[in-house]
Amino acid sequence: VVLLDNYSLLTEVVANPTAYGFSNATGVACTVSSSLFCSANTLVTPDAANTYVFADGVHPTTAAQKLSAQYALSVLKAPAQVGVVGAAAMTAGQRYAQRLMSYAPNVSDQAWHAFADAGYSKTDFGKAADSKNKYLLVGADRRISAGNVHAGLTLGYDRASGDLGAAAGEFNLKETSVGAYVGKKADQGAIMGYVRYGRLSADIDRNIALGAANRTESGSSKGAHYTIGVQGNLVLGTFANGKVKHGPVGGFAYEKMRLDGYDEAGNTSTSMSFGAQKREGMVASLGYQLRGEFGKVKPYASLSYEVDGTDADNIKARLKSAPTSFSTEAPKSDNGVRLKLGAQIDLAKNVNLVVGAERTFGKDSGQQTVFNLGVDARF
């Protein structure tokens, strides 16, 4: 059962009718005693059904009923709309693993290795909901044993902005993260394990159309994001006189994310309270890659199938004026294919420029485009 507050809504409309597209909130549209017997022939003016708030002493006009329907629909859609923020938060953990492996080939027998990577990504969740993300990731590692085994730490900052849906509102999401990783590189391939922890902060603006008026309800939430996983690749062979290596590439990770529940700041008929958002589960990928070495330029390409096994709890919500809540499903990401293209370019001895682009295919929700640019050094 979803409880609405039509009384407060109509009270707000009566207090400022012109804002909602009405010209009369004190009189009635019908010349007969009850709207049950009212018709186009018994209106006080031909357009009274669209300009008056009340048809008789109790019942709303056609336009006021349409406004009430907009109100009800906005309440029903609200939990799934704010759920886009939780879905957007999950993309940072998956991107982290991709970026670490972009720099793994440059680890050598030098004692230290450091990198900095910046990028942009856009994720589409369907129904005009999306997330546009800018990020910066820096890391440093040290060789801890013979055989190119390195261990390191990372610091990251992600900032996302996006739409909750078509004209449904916007959000801003920030995540500050720390991570640790250990990896080994050999002629036959590389493997890396990692952990990551991020603190989340979100500002959410939800738009509601009510007749001629557009209202915005705002709120804020904080949370946490955990990731642990492993990535690796193997070299099965070469061609082009040994200049191009090829072999499988894959990864496996567990992610958990929570955004705290929050109350919107307003105290109107449309102001709502939302429960916590929780997502967790496994993400896996398996594919094949090519990696070339042509002098100072080392291009790479890979094609992988990704399985997103994360589950999201239903999101609870209620009007702030209502005693009980209801829940709806949160947006989910789909399985799909990821294509990666890029290159490493030698800028100087032990210094490399890394450029890359990624695109997923076959996803109704979670379709993603990524661009990154970075530099790393060994010393």
Regions found by a protein language model. Name each.
Residues 16-36, 84-85, 126-131, 165-171, ...:
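Solvent-exposed, glycine/polar-rich loop segments of beta-barrel outer-membrane systems
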